């Protein structure tokens, strides 16, 4: 991935090898690898492709998965993945009741990966949740490993408070927990201004008198609660990493790509430069955006403009077509500020000689000459090389969440959702991936549940390529991916069956 430049600095705490690991390093649990097999998989020369065992391993929806280690840029495969079926059930004690005055305070206990509620078909008081995730680590695998173990727990915890609301799709979510929800068929949730000034309709103080609505209330759909739960879970996961890095060795940071299936809809949450696409009838439907210094230029520049102290008097928030030279002071040069999508000319000043906040193009673009992704988890100790300037204030843990309603379409066995880290997308276009999958799957036995794993393996092989005298090469003798590559192929037809 477009991660950390060599030589970037870490803080004095949270990065020492003397601290214990939060979780031991390993490959995804669902691969079922022994320690010896994990060691053998870390061959940077042969780069064996790991897949699910046909005999013993099966993921939900017959999901396919394959991965391969990098060509030597890091000792370990810094990608991580997890896939689980969980059961969302209201917490004992009534999480949906009116919260007490202390409910907004931070929890005293944090998720530890234990006690996740697995699917239980005998219980009708909750909702089944399907979960897939990919984490692309940089500057170490610590954050990616921790997130792969705990992020699903945070999502589950956020959903537990609202599970009863989500199950009752006929009624809009209440504005305040503990209130009787309004039925949109019988209550518009609005009053005229005159009626609101009179205090509403009905006898004051009467038990049947609804709460006074002074202005129109927003009608919040149920899927927005799920989106909010996922967004909150990402934030809580990042805060947990920040807290625990002082007592555990949680190295580096990671991007995060998560898919949650709940009540007939897929929620695709992305923070970083991994990517998700749906292939339906051969058509590509993008389900994520990449978050890089280029795509988030204006957000980063605006933050630096509003809080210039974050630049440490070493960087300028302005963008120029190239580095400004001292001999150009006083001349008019092209530039871009946070409020601009186009370019204009400005008179070069002394401050413009500072290194630009964002420098480089494409995969070489970096924030403060250090990191190539702008959203993800971790990186709390990341600093500009040989300085005390922290980069974390410019990085966001907030994901973009897109929703795909499976109930709107009838999907065939070759309609799939592809999730992959940037090791795949750096060398293959969306259309190339779609063409490969649509050509591969029809040649497999439609009754073979392993066909999606074989499709994932085929994609990894196409991106890795073959080792030749001039390195790893793919079709048309293009340079293959030397990065870690992880791929899910998720058949959508199983989502229709679940719904």
Model-derived features: positions:
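PP2C/PPM-type serine/threonine phosphatase catalytic core
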Residues: 2-131, 137-499
């Amino acid at each position: 991935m477009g991660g950390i430049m060599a030589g970037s600095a870490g803080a004095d705490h949270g990065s020492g090898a003397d601290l214990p690991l939060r979780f031991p390093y390993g490959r995804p649990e669902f691969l079922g690898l022994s320690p010896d097999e994990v060691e053998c998989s870390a061959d940077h020369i042969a780069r064996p492709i790991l897949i699910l065992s046909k005999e013993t391993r099966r993921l939900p929806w017959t999901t396919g998965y394959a991965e391969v280690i990098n060509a030597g840029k890091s000792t370990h495969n810094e990608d991580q993945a997890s896939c689980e079926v969980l059961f969302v059930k209201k917490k004992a004690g009534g999480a949906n009741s009116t919260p007490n005055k202390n409910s907004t305070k931070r929890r005293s206990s944090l998720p530890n990966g234990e006690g996740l509620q697995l699917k239980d078909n005998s219980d009708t008081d909750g909702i089944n949740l399907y979960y897939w995730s990919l984490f692309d680590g940089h500057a170490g695998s610590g954050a990616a490993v921790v997130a792969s173990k705990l992020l699903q727990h945070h999502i589950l915890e956020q959903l537990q408070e609202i599970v009863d609301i989500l199950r009752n799709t006929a009624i809009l979510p209440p504005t305040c927990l503990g209130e009787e929800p309004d039925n949109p068929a019988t209550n518009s949730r609005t009053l005229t201004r005159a009626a609101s000034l009179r205090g509403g309709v009905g006898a004051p103080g009467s038990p049947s008198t609804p709460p006074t609505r002074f202005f129109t209330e927003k009608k919040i759909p149920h899927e927005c609660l799920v989106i909010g739960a996922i967004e909150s879970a990402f934030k809580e996961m990042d805060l947990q990493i920040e807290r625990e890095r002082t007592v555990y060795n949680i190295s580096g940071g990671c991007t995060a790509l998560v898919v949650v299936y709940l009540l007939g809809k897929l929620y695709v949450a992305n923070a970083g430069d991994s990517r998700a696409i749906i292939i339906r009838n051969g058509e590509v439907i993008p389900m994520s955006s990449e978050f890089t210094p280029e795509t988030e230029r204006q957000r980063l520049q605006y933050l630096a403009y509003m809080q210039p102290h974050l630049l440490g008097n070493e960087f300028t928030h302005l963008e120029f077509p190239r580095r400004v030279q001292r001999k150009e002071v006083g001349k008019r040069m092209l530039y871009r500020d946070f409020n601009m999508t186009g370019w204009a000319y400005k008179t070069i000043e002394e401050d413009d000689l500072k290194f630009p906040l964002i420098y480089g193009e494409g995969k070489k673009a970096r924030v403060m000459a250090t990191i190539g992704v702008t959203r993800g988890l971790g990186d709390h100790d990341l600093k500009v090389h040989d300085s005390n300037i922290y980069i974390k204030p410019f990085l966001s843990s907030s994901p973009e969440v897109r929703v795909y309603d499976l109930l709107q379409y009838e999907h065939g066995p070759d309609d799939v959702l592809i999730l992959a880290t940037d090791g795949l997308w750096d060398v293959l276009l969306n259309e190339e991936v779609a063409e490969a999958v649509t050509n591969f799957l029809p040649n497999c036995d439609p009754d073979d549940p392993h066909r999606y794993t074989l499709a994932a393996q085929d994609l990894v092989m196409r991106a890795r390529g073959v080792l030749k005298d001039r390195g790893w090469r793919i079709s048309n003798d293009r340079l293959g991916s030397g990065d870690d590559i992880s791929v899910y192929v998720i058949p959508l037809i199983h989502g229709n069956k679940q719904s």
